[in-house]
Amino acid sequence: MFHMSWIDRAVARENEILRIIKSFGKSKLEFILVGGYAVSALARQRFSVDCDVVIPKNLAKKFEELLRKEGYKVGQTKAGFDEAYGGEFASFRKKVGDLPVTIDLLIGSLVSRGTSASWSYQYIKENSVNATLITGKESLEVSVPEKELLVAFKIHAGREADLRDIVMLTHGLDLGKVRKHTQRGEMSKVREHIASELKSLNNPKVVLSLKGVYEIGGDTSESVSRAARLLENLTKST
């Protein structure tokens, strides 16, 4: 009996996610890609096991109908997702081989559970850009939050994975925009996140994990320094 390798299974899962993103576009459904795939489109490709999209509230039923038609079922909310995001969302799951594929719909807004900050779909749309998502041999035009807004989401989420993404997104950032997008929710908690993230940037394990997740062979010290400067500047103004 033929057994797929772990890499083959992971690629099959990624291909399924790309297929679903394409099907949203073909169905003329409006959405903005956030999470790991948005980072891949704006910075450097990184492995992501699920797909997060922010959608207009009035299209929620159409998205759900399409996903059900494609064999997805309403799944249990993942703990990681639950820790990071609040607000209204629906999580859909399907198995590809023996690996689960998860599509998370953030309905009407993106809400940071840890800081109670909220960004409406309209706000995200007004601060989004078109980008090319490239995975393997596939490429796809998608709408994603501009870098500065994506960094703000990551600062509010405050997990180690988010800090790695911040490091990868810091090239050519507009500090004023990051500040504007970040200043919402419980600012005392935002300041705590920034202080914790600055401390983590001095941890060699974080740099090593950065290289692993993004498959970077070279020196990352410049990117880490840029991220530290960004967070230090935000500390002065938040």
Name every feature range the model reports, one short phrase each.
Residues 1-238:
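Compositionally biased terminal segments of proteins
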